[in-house]
Every structure is written in C-alpha cells, then in structure tokens.
Amino acid sequence: MSIRERLLATVSRYIAAYNEFDPSAMKTVRTVSCLTHGIAPTCKFTQSVEEHTKHMMLSRGVFRSVNASIVDDGTTVVDEGSRKVVVKVKLRCETIVGPYENEAMFIMAMDEEGTLVDGIFQFLDTACFRQFQGRLEEAHVSRD
C-alpha cells in the first residue's frame, strides 16, 4: 500500500470512529499525544486525547447520532511528505433540539507510518454552529 493510500485509509478509519461517537473508538485511530484544535476564530480550542474524551462524553447528552462523511468534490489534499491530509466533511446529527448540519475542513497530521492521527485541525462553519448553540440555549432557558 502506498503512503497516499495509507493516509487516506487512516482518514476513513477516523471518520468511521467519529461516527461511532465513542471515545474508545476514537482512541484506536489516534496517537496518545494527538491534539485536536478548533481553528475557527469564534471556536478556538486545543484538546488532548483525554480532554477530547471528556468533551465527547459530555456531548453524548446532546447528540443522539452523528454522521460525518467526506465530501468528494475534489477538495481533498494529500501531502505525502508531511503526512497531512485535508478533507471537507459534511456533518449530519440528530440532537436533543432536532437536526444539526454543518460543514468543516479537517487538516489531519499523521504519524510517520501514516496509520494514526497525530493532530487534527478543525475549521467548522461557525455561522451554522452559532445557530445550533442558540437552539441549545433556547431549549435550556425554556426548561428552567
């Protein structure tokens, strides 16, 4: 298998684990030192594997199902030398406040073998995310 094929296979395994929305599944495709970075101006964060696990556990109370898929529109970029892949991702989720859809760009850095994710940079469409946050806040206020 070429390095390009390995990198793309790792991205596919990551997306499959993401769809399980299970921290244990996510850990199987990430290095122990993997960091997740939110890089949108209004949604900046950096999380270790353990911090990401805690975030996922809290989010399970909001998200009932998660479906992420790679948008195959020619935007995928594979840099074999740096072991990085850039993919456009479509997110469709069922949540406690109804459907949530968004698009994101994931920049994924892999380990030397190209089989584990060593860093993830996520750029979400923040307008969609803010609308979703507003719906969550409205639901929370109406419960109080």
Swiss-Prot record:
Result of knocking out the encoding gene: Leads to a complete loss of austinoid production.
GO BP annotation list: terpenoid biosynthetic process
InterPro entries the UniProt entry points to: Fungal_Meroterpenoid_Isomerase (IPR050977)
Family: Belongs to the trt14 isomerase family.
Other facts: In A.calidoustus, the austinoid gene cluster lies on a contiguous DNA region, while clusters from E.nidulans and P.brasilianum are split in their respective genomes. Genetic rearrangements provoked variability among the clusters and E.nidulans produces the least number of austionoid derivatives with the end products austinol and dehydroaustinol, while P.brasilianum can produce until acetoxydehydroaustin, and A.calidoustus produces the highest number of identified derivatives.
Subunit structure, interactors included: Homodimer.
Functional note: Part of the gene cluster that mediates the biosynthesis of calidodehydroaustin, a fungal meroterpenoid. The first step of the pathway is the synthesis of 3,5-dimethylorsellinic acid by the polyketide synthase ausA. 3,5-dimethylorsellinic acid is then prenylated by the polyprenyl transferase ausN. Further epoxidation by the FAD-dependent monooxygenase ausM and cyclization by the probable terpene cyclase ausL lead to the formation of protoaustinoid A. May play a possible function as a regulator.
Protein name as catalogued: Austinoid biosynthesis cluster protein S
Organism: Aspergillus calidoustus
